[in-house]
């Protein structure tokens, strides 16, 4: 049986202390813009002010193939998924390069790649070889859906138990943006043309095929709404179902998480329904150029940290955002207050602003 423990809220006392400390630092109030809000969020997640710099940031890339990819909805053949899993494991993918400079390590997990697992470690949570063609059939069976969601829960637990203090969800799978578009359209009541983008670089004919596949899948999923598990069974696939479980369980475990592009954020939309309130533990790493991503972010009430017109997936946008998040933590933790630095404050209300006391767990 699929179930998640209740999601608690980030710590309000640490949030208030962090906001007060931001206002006491040697700068005009609000001068660091969104960095201030991000630092306050980290403090509330860590239950301490000032917050600690992240020591074990971890990227998990969830890999899986989608039967709909054989309908001409991608510019790349399905076998690229297995090849890219090997590339990520070898350290040669974009996510490896960006995670390295961001101070994070990378794990790839095969949930439904249409090939034998590259290794026992990578395939430890494999559910099946490839997910069904969602335009004509369910992506998964009931048991497979439960297994995939549980796999995501277990992977989150494994990472948190091993000491991860920030998680990034990434994706790898030819055809996964088609499945993601269905999830977003179903949960935001959007038309297929509003959520379908050009993915890996398809042409206009490919876009038309992709839109038709999303339309057909939406017709199939309407009867199961608003059931999130039923939606994942019909149209998600094992990789997206696992991402949903991962994002939900990260929140249950009070661990901050950065979302990546449209595939991850679509799964997060479902995760919010599996574990209400989970979104408070997430930040949107970036805004993808995929049109459905903006709709999904709006539905979650999340603003992207960066907007660099990226559309790769893998966790790359979130890895870039991690560098910004680290800067936010550093500013709140390392800057001096007006009192500490002996710097005069701007006199507005005649009140001398001093640093608030530290808050520890």
UniProtKB/Swiss-Prot annotation:
Q: Which residues form the active site?
A: 314 (proton acceptor)
Instruction: Tell me one GO molecular function of this protein.
Output: nicotinate-nucleotide-dimethylbenzimidazole phosphoribosyltransferase activity
Origin superkingdom? Bacteria
Q: In which pathway does it act?
A: Nucleoside biosynthesis; alpha-ribazole biosynthesis; alpha-ribazole from 5,6-dimethylbenzimidazole: step 1/2
Q: Does the keyword Translocase apply?
A: no
Q: Recorded E.C. number(s)?
A: 2.4.2.21
**Family the UniProt entry places it in:** Belongs to the CobT family.
Name of the protein this chain belongs to:
Nicotinate-nucleotide--dimethylbenzimidazole phosphoribosyltransferase
- Give the species this sequence originates from: Mycobacterium tuberculosis (strain ATCC 25177 / H37Ra)
Write the gene name: cobT
């Amino acid at each position: 049986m699929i179930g998640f423990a209740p999601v608690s809220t980030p710590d309000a006392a640490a949030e208030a202390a962090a906001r007060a400390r931001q206002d006491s630092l040697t700068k005009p109030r609000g001068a660091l813009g969104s960095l201030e809000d991000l630092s306050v969020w980290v403090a509330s997640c860590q239950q301490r002010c000032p917050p600690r710099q992240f020591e074990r940031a971890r990227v998990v890339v969830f890999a899986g193939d989608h039967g709909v990819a054989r309908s001409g909805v991608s510019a790349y053949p399905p076998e690229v998924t297995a090849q890219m899993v090997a590339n990520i494991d070898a350290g040669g993918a974009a996510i490896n390069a960006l995670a390295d400079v961001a101070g994070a390590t990378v794990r790839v997990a095969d949930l439904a790649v249409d090939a034998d697992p590259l290794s026992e470690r990578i395939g430890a949570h494999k559910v099946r070889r490839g997910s069904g063609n969602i335009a004509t059939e369910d992506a998964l069976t009931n048991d497979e859906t439960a297994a995939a969601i549980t796999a995501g829960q277990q992977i989150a637990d494994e990472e948190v138990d091993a000491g991860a203090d920030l998680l990034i969800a990434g994706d790898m799978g030819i055809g996964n943006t088609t499945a993601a578009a269905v999830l977003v359209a179903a949960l935001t009541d959007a038309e297929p043309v509003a959520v379908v983008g050009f993915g890996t670089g398809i042409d206009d004919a490919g876009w038309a095929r992709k839109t038709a596949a999303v339309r057909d899948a939406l017709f199939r999923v309407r009867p199961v709404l608003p059931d999130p598990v039923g939606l994942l069974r019909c149209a998600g696939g094992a990789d997206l179902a696992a991402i949903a479980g991962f994002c939900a369980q990260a929140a249950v475990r009070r661990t901050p998480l950065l979302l990546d592009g449209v595939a991850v954020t679509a799964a997060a939309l479902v995760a919010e329904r599996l574990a209400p309130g989970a979104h408070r533990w997430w930040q949107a790493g970036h805004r993808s150029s995929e049109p459905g991503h903006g709709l999904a972010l709006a539905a979650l009430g999340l603003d992207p940290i960066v907007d660099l017109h990226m559309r790769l997936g893998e966790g790359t946008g979130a890895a870039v955002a991690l560098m910004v998040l680290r800067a936010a933590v550093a500013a709140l933790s390392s800057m001096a207050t007006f009192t500490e630095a002996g710097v005069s404050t701007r006199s507005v209300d005649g009140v001398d602003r001093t640093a608030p006391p530290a808050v520890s767990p």
